[in-house]
């Protein structure tokens, strides 16, 4: 790495590697971690060394050197305590790294990056980039050397309230671990004499020339549920909320969306239910259909009244029955369809009956969906149960029972039937029947739609559009914002923008900093004040991303101006269900954002940043390109 100071990518790659090397299961405190990463990346040029002194580089070097040495037990990386990022693992013989360059602690020069309000928001107990003293790791998993020698008492081992750390309090190091596990250094330190807690060197600093002995400040409150992380970048990389919601966003929310359409798609169902014996139909309790005299003395003496539950049809192919308040609650329509039991003498489509013999029975195909379901008919003195021919586009799974109020309509027990086309011998309907049957409905036109029904259907339509069809360039997972609650990280804790704590924003707000006016030529006023503060375009998606919105959010993107848009460090990778964040320059983009005017937004070096350099006239090219280069050199 001869040009180490120029090779910014090496650092980011090392950071990514350290992210990968560490377990992703820890719980982080979002506020301080986000700030710490940003203050690190923002300030890294304020000290001379770029790569060799960088914590990630040290970390990688010490990992490489310690991995080889056989005599020392490696603590599992997820448990490695904080300082092992900077120092070689303490268990081995103390190795002094080649270059002890500056650590990126919060020195007075970089402290100016914090505005006053931020300094109040974050009391001194939250450590900035590398901690100047040991921070207690959690031993919840397996005992590691680093954890039981840590500077503070940890809550799993010491429950005695008198032993909780005060600054000058004496306590015995824990002797519960079997000596076999302990390294010699650990035994030496945990033998029977008492050590004042504040005068012990922290185990990682033990006889290494790195830091002076650290005196821990008294710890105000420490919640044992927040375990402090391992490598600085891995640790700062994401917090609990964002991590879980990244996962949930991609899996759970998507499947929640899909749940309503779990009513199977037409193609699947038709093959699944055609001629199926009742064992395959999702458990429908046996229907008791009451057959009774038609009061209106119509041509047939018997008629069957079925409750009609009109379900929202996810495929949208059956327009006639799109009327339910939501895809999940099926509200029964007040309409009844009268079904006349068939005569055996009729000639029609074959129907498999339950008892096994075939009965002929006419079907009117294609008008309503007929879910296979037994209808009791009285016929030749004995009742056989017929299956009506099935064209299921719209199976209903519902547990509501509809109790009709008028005495004419019988109560039907069991799960209500889906819309069924009346099966009849000669005449199609009896217009005189008390329940005003639907007259030969074609699926395209709904039968007597009330205004309310129409409105409901329109809403369904809209919701389905939003949920099912992915909008241009935005994923279904992202559209989940429309129906689910917005991504938790869409509203950061301090209710400022996601970028408010980045060093860029900080120095801009305080009016200081070299790059304040860097883009003033190219930046519209709106980009400075409003958009970058309120609605960051890179991530997270706005609470309700709609197609129209997507274009509007990008208006300043083409000015090539906004630096946050160009490459946001804190953008969790939303692709491929990945759980952590990677700090490499990835080729992917934030989910619902159309491609930038120039080819690759996340470039490997500042030159390819402007992929379209050829397009500019030479004069313009010089100025703009120089600005970009300067900006990147300073920032990254």
Swiss-Prot record:
Compositional bias annotation for Low complexity: 355-383, 471-484
Ranges where the record places region Disordered: 111-205, 222-284, 313-387, 400-451, 467-550, 572-604
UniProt KW Transit peptide keyword: no
Composition bias type Polar residues, residue spans: 131-159, 166-178, 188-204, 237-255, 315-354, 400-412, 422-439, 572-589
Chain segments carrying region Required for targeting the protein to eisosomes: 1-297
Coiled-coil residues: none
Keywords, in A-Z order: Cytoplasm
Localization terms from the record: Cytoplasm, Cell cortex; Cell tip
Biased composition (Basic and acidic residues): 503-512
Claim: DNA damage is one of the keywords in the record: no
GO BP, sorted A to Z: plasma membrane organization
GO cellular component terms attached to this protein's record: cell cortex of cell tip; eisosome filament
Highest taxon, organism lineage: Eukaryota
Principal subcellular localization: cytoplasm
Role according to the record: Important for the biogenesis of filamentous eisosomes, large cytoplasmic protein assemblies that localize to specialized domains on the plasma membrane to cluster specific proteins at sites of membrane invaginations.
Quaternary context: Component of eisosomes, large cytoplasmic protein assemblies that localize to specialized domains termed MCCs on the plasma membrane.
Protein name, as recorded: Eisosome protein sle1
Species: Schizosaccharomyces pombe (strain 972 / ATCC 24843)
